[in-house]
Swiss-Prot record:
One of its GO terms (biological process) is RNA processing. The gene is pnp. Residues 713-722 have a biased composition (Basic and acidic residues). Keywords: Cytoplasm, Magnesium, Metal-binding, Nucleotidyltransferase, RNA-binding, Transferase. This is Polyribonucleotide nucleotidyltransferase. It is an enzyme of class 2 (transferase). Residues 623-691 form the S1 motif domain. It comes from Rickettsia africae (strain ESF-5). Residues 699-712 have a biased composition (Low complexity). It comes from the Bacteria. The keyword Cytoplasm applies. Its EC number is 2.7.7.8. Signal peptide: none annotated.
Length: 748
């Protein structure tokens, strides 16, 4: 019944198996990928008819993680997979980027690739398997897919490169890099790094590139046995058509490209296609040429003009040389109510960035195949239509926005303080207010400025730059800080972010059939110099984090308690913790390890909540003195609430140093009296005395001391800061079972 074909290779100690002919046989291409206990089904479907006139390849990649793959039922009300998660969107883009450039340039048939994770093994990189499976499925389909792509993941642990590290290993790795390519060229790189040098990054790419070559071999073997006939493709346009358009309109196109302003240049260029189509109207009516052929030839001429200026004259359309960076302007503290804000402008690209602090309760909950976890740092990239002067409605975040936001997140994340050093959750929102190339790297720069102004103790300022490439044969030019047109007509978009000491994020996309390591080396070094220049401009405005938080930021304190006391703070059905929050106005978060984080809008609210918590968890010592409240009076004595929710009993003989007839003659419910703990009965209930209690020293152990280190950066505007909100770290301070391990106060 099945004509199954299987190819396998031992890769990094595990067997990678590709098979076709058993599942999804009606799809143009279908491959089952297996490694360890991971199983993916990757399919490719190609429409029979071309979709002419759209000007781009209508390729759609959908990566799906099925909950059953990890033995889970989807959470939420609807128990089925719904809208793609950010993780699924990011992997879909990861698959798309090395594959898209390898189709025939004239191919415009709608193409859908679906990669579904059917069984999940955390010991295997399913995103890498998805790229491999998608490439294999396309190689079997009729699509004119010109090269075969494979990919690998690279980590750096203890100075050694690790191929396809597990999730557990990635937690200790200095590098998380994905590289994809063909048998002779690199097509795509994406990474997060902990301040690695350009040399280390290049070596990591080489290591990954060499590692996936055996995978390309088995994909080729599978395609040789199972592929379908490829669609025959024609040239995009006749060569004679291009020559005729050049003869008539090249001067006008050159004049338009000589305009340095993006808006004016675009306006003039947009007028030309109508003139060209009008000139060829009779040829269009006679079906000698199609509109699409004419527009394609015109775009090719525009590309030639831009590229020749760069390669032959070392001159770009805005007048810069290949290494020049556009003019930079930085401003901080624009938004008075935000916890931190910055405006970063580079040429005609601009990003308005804000920073907001929250509690651990505000952290992003992520439900994945690995299980549920929280993200403390969130970065949202927004690209509104007005940034490029387009009249379009605002929509939900696009795949592009999700991808750009994650790239900026990778650039910033390695330099953030850990939760012990800085207890807040952090949300950064970067809105692109103008765009003419490299808006994601403007987001990185603006985020660094906003975080420092907000007072986040980042390790070092971070800047990002986008590099471009124009390549004709062996002749090439690497461009620093590319414009939108240079991205569109160029051959590469190579984004590099990092500090003055090293790289934190890298992303490379290629539009040609790949680049070699010589070009990558030149691009990395040129990016380093550009990054240092940008950092120099940023440092003129702010070079280190402020020592004080915004007056609008919440106050926070963290204490450590005995884990057995957690239930006492929470109370039955959450009654106690709810009462503390309602009466104090604070927010409280309790971790399983006994870490209690308290957040409030001001110092007084924080103190009320903290005192209530300490009163609950404190273990009183015999001989301590407390201010107690009489809760019930009996003939034999009185019950007194002496600390937190703890009550003790004062026998009638311990009420006074003198003889009394009745307890009620001395004590009434609600009275505040000093009591001394003198012991516990055989049931563990406290025995108290009022006699001579005021002659002994009072207890002060319920309030651990806090060491506060007050510092202030006088260079910042006084009116934007509250001098009482200081960063303060204290050493361990014991108070019996209540032990303050890291108390940080940012008080009003």
């Amino acid at each position: 019944m099945f004509n199954e074909i299987t190819k396998s290779v031992t890769w990094n100690g595990q067997v990678l198996e590709l098979s076709t002919g058993k599942i999804a046989r009606q799809a143009d291409g279908a491959v089952t990928v297996k490694m360890g206990n991971s199983v993916l089904l990757c399919t490719a479907v190609v429409a029979n008819k071309a979709k002419e006139g759209i000007g781009f390849l209508p390729l759609t990649i959908n990566y799906r993680e099925m909950a059953y793959a990890a033995g889970k039922i989807p959470g939420g009300f609807f128990k089925h997979e719904g809208k793609a998660s950010d993780r699924e969107v990011l992997v879909s883009r990861l698959i798309d980027r090395p594959i898209r450039p390898l189709f025939h340039p004239a191919f415009v048939n709608e193409t859908h690739v679906t990669c579904s994770v059917l069984s999940y093994d955390p010991e295997t990189p399913v995103d890498i398997l998805a790229i491999i499976g998608a490439s294999a499925a396309l190689s079997l389909s009729p699509a004119p897919y010109l090269e075969i792509v494979a990919a690998s993941k690279v980590g750096l642990i203890n100075g050694e490169f690790v191929l396809n590290p597990t999730l557990a290993l990635l937690k200790t790795s200095q590098l998380d890099l994905v590289v994809a390519g063909t048998s002779d060229s690199v097509m795509m790189v994406e990474s997060e790094a902990h301040l690695l040098s350009e040399e280390q990054m290049l070596e990591a790419v080489k290591f990954g590139f060499e590692s996936f070559q055996p995978v390309i071999k088995i994909i080729k073997e599978l395609a040789e046995e199972a592929k379908k006939p490829k669609l025959e493709m024609q040239a995009l346009y006749p060569a004679s058509l291009k020559k005729e358009i050049e003869k008539l309109f090249v001067k006008e196109i050159e004049q338009a490209f000589a305009i340095k302003s993006k808006q004016e240049r675009s306006t003039n260029l947009d007028l030309i296609p109508e003139k060209v189509l009008t000139h060829f109207v009779s040829d269009i009516e006679n079906k000698k040429y199609s509109n699409y052929q004419i527009e394609s030839a015109l775009k090719a001429i525009e590309s030639d003009i831009l590229r020749n200026e760069i390669l032959e004259k070392n001159r770009r359309i805005d007048g810069r040389s290949t290494t020049d960076i556009r003019q930079i302007a930085c401003e901080i503290g624009l938004l008075p109510s935000a916890h931190g804000s910055a405006l970063f402008t580079r040429g005609e690209t601009q990003s308005l960035v804000s920073t907001t602090f929250g509690t651990s309760l505000d952290e992003q909950i992520v439900d994945s195949l690995e299980g549920e976890y929280k993200e403390r740092f969130m970065l949202n990239y927004i690209f509104p239509p007005y940034s490029v002067n387009e009249a379009m409605p605002m929509k939900a975040p696009s795949r592009r926005e999700v991808g750009h936001g994650k790239l900026a997140w990778r650039a910033i994340n390695p330099i953030l303080p850990n939760k012990v050093q800085f207890p807040y959750s952090i949300r950064v929102v970067a809105e692109t207010t103008e765009s003419n190339g490299s808006s994601s790297m403007a987001t990185v720069c603006g985020s660094s400025l906003a975080l420092m102004y907000a007072g986040v103790p980042i390790k070092a300022p971070v800047a990002g730059i986008a590099m471009g490439l124009v390549k004709e044969g062996k002749n090439f030019a690497v461009l620093s800080d590319i414009l939108g047109d240079e991205d569109y007509f160029g051959d590469m978009d190579f984004k590099v972010a990092g500090t003055s000491e090293g790289i934190t994020a890298l992303q490379m996309d290629i539009k040609i059939s790949g680049v070699d390591f010589k070009i990558m080396k030149v691009a990395l070094e040129q990016a380093r110099l550009g990054r240092l220049h940008i950092l120099e401009q940023m440092n003129k405005v702010i070079s280190k984090p402020n020592n004080e938080l915004s007056k609008n930021a919440p106050s926070t304190t963290t204490i450590k308690i005995d884990k057995d006391k957690i239930r006492d703070i929470i109370g039955p059905g959450g009654k106690v913790i709810k009462e503390i929050c309602e009466t104090s106005g604070a927010k409280i978060d309790i971790s399983d390890d006994g870490t209690v984080s308290v957040y409030a809008s001001d110092r007084d609210k924080l103190k009320v909540a903290l005192d209530k918590i300490k009163a609950i968890v404190v273990e009183p010592e015999i001989g301590e003195i407390f201010n107690g409240t009489v809760v019930k009076v009996l003939d034999s004595g009185a019950f007194i609430n002496y600390v937190g929710n703890k009550d003790g009993f004062v026998h009638i003989s311990e009420v006074s140093g003198e003889r009394i007839e009745t307890v009620s003659s001395v004590l009434k419910q609600g009275d505040i009296v000093k009591v001394k703990l003198i012991g516990f009965d055989n049931k563990g209930k406290a025995k108290l005395t009022i006699k001579n209690a005021d002659k002994d020293k009072s207890s002060n152990n319920t309030k651990p001391k806090t060491n506060v280190n007050n510092t202030k950066d006088n260079s910042e505007p006084e009116q934007r800061r509250d001098s009482s909100k200081k960063r303060a770290w204290n050493e361990d301070n014991n108070a019996e079972t209540a032990e303050v391990i890291t108390e940080r106060k940012y008080f009003n």
